[in-house]
Amino acid sequence: MARVKRGVTSHAKHKKVLKAAKGYYGRRKNTIRIAKQAVEKGLQYAYRDRKNRKRNFRSLWIQRLNAAAREHGLTYSRLIDGLAKAGIVVDRKALSELAIHEPAAFAAVVEQARAALPAETAQAA
């Protein structure tokens, strides 16, 4: 059987890694050993941050809802409690978009949540 030197295969692999390392700084972009490490680390960061992005956006929506609810005299936790008791099922993303782009509609939702809360809880806020 003929001897296979794998020059074409390794060249293709190296090109693939260097293409992924395009835009990196220093030897990370053109030295295959260092570029390979940098690309692998970048993929690890990408995997981790795809998970973190979901947490970060949920946290952002909650912060926005808390600020918007406080403008109407409720806290975030009381707003969510009131929505649950009123049977209003809207996710936090939609609520925060409503608070930003449709303040009048958000105010109506807050009023429904406030009406569903017990009287002393609504007065305390």
From Swiss-Prot:
Any one Gene Ontology cellular component term annotated for this protein:
ribonucleoprotein complex
Question: Which domain of life does the UniProt lineage start with?
Answer: Bacteria
Q: Which biological process, per GO, is one annotated for this protein?
A: translation
- State the CDD domains in the record: Ribosomal_L20 (cd07026)
GO terms, molecular function: rRNA binding; structural constituent of ribosome
Keywords on record: Ribonucleoprotein, Ribosomal protein, RNA-binding, rRNA-binding
Q: Does the keyword Thylakoid apply?
A: no
Q: Which family does it belong to?
A: Belongs to the bacterial ribosomal protein bL20 family.
What function does the entry list? Binds directly to 23S ribosomal RNA and is necessary for the in vitro assembly process of the 50S ribosomal subunit. It is not involved in the protein synthesizing functions of that subunit.
Q: Which PANTHER family does this one have?
A: 39S RIBOSOMAL PROTEIN L20
Q: What is this protein called?
A: Large ribosomal subunit protein bL20
Biological source species: Methylobacterium sp. (strain 4-46)
Q: Which gene encodes it?
A: rplT
